[in-house]
Amino acid sequence: MPLPKIATPLYELELPSTKQTIKYRPFLVKEEKLLVLALESEDTKQITTAIKTVIKNCISTRGVKVEDLPTFDIEYLFLNIRGKSVGEEVELSIIAPDDGVTPIPVNIDLDEIKVVENKEHNKQIRLDDSLMMEMKYPSLDQFIKNNFDFDDNSNVDRSFELIASCIDKIFNEEEVWSTADVSKKEVVEFLEQMNSAQFKQIEKFFETMPKLSHTLEVVNPKTKVKSTVVLEGLSSFFG
């Protein structure tokens, strides 16, 4: 007689980028083992790949392509899956901002951590009186490729490739040019034609992108100085 199956609960959350409600389950022991091995390797690319694999396994809603999700969706999803799997509170050690050396232990409820949106963020960029550009968010795969693949290309080249991959279309009142219809080289050459003011608008798009963020107040036990600390990005919430 085969052993019985263990029932796994399902939970719901709303993806920050699309507002789509999806269903997910906690990760299993075999998936936790995969994550532990990746974390022990201290290899950022391996950790990110493990996170993506676990998320794929845990999402039960059909049609969700993890590879295409923005980085902040991936981070938010994983944080919630982790919370339902091993506990919704995480213990961290934060270095006191006032002296830069004293560790402060804190407990953070994962339910309080949200993706924060900047009011100044805009996916559309005006290049001149007639020409505009619409951006799209970098996927996790693009983020990995441009940050953790070290080849002969310079950092500047990788940055331009990342930006080029995040341009969705260029348009005016009469015509639309989809970047899916042209080569990456052509898009990079288009970027290189921009002046400094135009390029700064692209930088602003990335700087104001939605991000996983949590603000808390800490008190240095030695100096009694109270400080405000902002934690951003998934790595900030690993104990």
Predicted features along the sequence, with ranges:
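Long C-terminal interaction/binding lobes of large macromolecular proteins
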Residues: 1-239
